């Protein structure tokens, strides 16, 4: 057995292999197909986004894609990616994973006019000088998740602004009136107590 090992070692040193040499990476060898091409999953990026051509700086709608009527029209949005901030991780400051979505709020006809006005008042800090509503997300290390988060933020804004306040019932009006009366009564009581304390501290100068 030892002699056989020595013979194999000597032949390998001389450049002659009795058996085919082992693969450098077993995982890569398993992923190789019979025709020599590398196996790729159906969820690989080049199969999910065949028209992207490796571009990670901007997002565009693939050709032939249909947009649902109840969803956000992606062709009216300006979507871009940039470096994600924050400490730690190998992808930080190396991959464009932070998503930024912006659109002109005043001309967004896919949102009702009253809803747009309410969004402009409620989220005025997210609107720039050009009237663009800007939303960003860097909660994930993946671009598509951050993009989905930005779109969900837009949906939440529209849903929140679309809700109309409910009319108060008679019981609510009565309860509100009682609370105001109790609050005024307590305020006057505290005022009388404070006035009595100030009067007790007063010293007569004879």
Swiss-Prot record:
Keywords for the protein's UniProt record, in alphabetical order: Hydrolase, Methylation, Mitochondrion, Protein biosynthesis, Ribonucleoprotein, Ribosomal protein, Transit peptide
GO biological process, one term: rescue of stalled ribosome
UniProt-listed InterPro entries: Mito_Release_Factor_mL62 (IPR052104), Pep_chain_release_fac_I (IPR000352)
Domain of life of the source: Eukaryota
Transit peptide limits: 1-29
Gene3D superfamilies associated with the record: 3.30.160.20
Family: Belongs to the prokaryotic/mitochondrial release factor family. Mitochondrion-specific ribosomal protein mL62 subfamily.
Name recorded for this polypeptide: Large ribosomal subunit protein mL62
């Amino acid at each position: 057995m030892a002699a056989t090992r020595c013979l194999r070692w000597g032949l390998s040193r001389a450049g002659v292999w009795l058996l085919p040499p082992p693969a450098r990476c077993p995982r890569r060898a398993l992923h190789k197909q019979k025709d020599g091409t590398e196996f790729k999953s159906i969820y690989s990026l080049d199969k999910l986004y065949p028209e992207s051509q490796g571009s990670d700086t901007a997002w565009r709608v693939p050709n032939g894609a249909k947009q649902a009527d109840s969803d956000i029209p992606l062709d009216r949005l300006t979507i871009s990616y940039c470096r994600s901030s924050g400490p730690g991780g190998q992808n930080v400051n190396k991959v464009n994973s932070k998503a930024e979505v912006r659109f002109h709020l005043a001309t967004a006809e896919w949102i009702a006019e009253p809803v747009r006005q309410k969004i402009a008042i409620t989220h005025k800090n997210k609107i720039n000088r050009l009237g663009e509503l800007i939303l960003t997300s860097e909660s994930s290390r993946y671009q598509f998740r951050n993009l989905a988060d930005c779109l969900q933020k837009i949906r939440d804004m529209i849903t929140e602004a679309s809700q109309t306040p409910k009319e108060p019932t008679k019981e609510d009006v009565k309860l509100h009136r009682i609370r105001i009366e109790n609050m005024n009564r307590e305020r006057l009581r505290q005022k009388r107590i404070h006035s009595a304390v100030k009067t007790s501290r007063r010293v007569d100068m004879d």
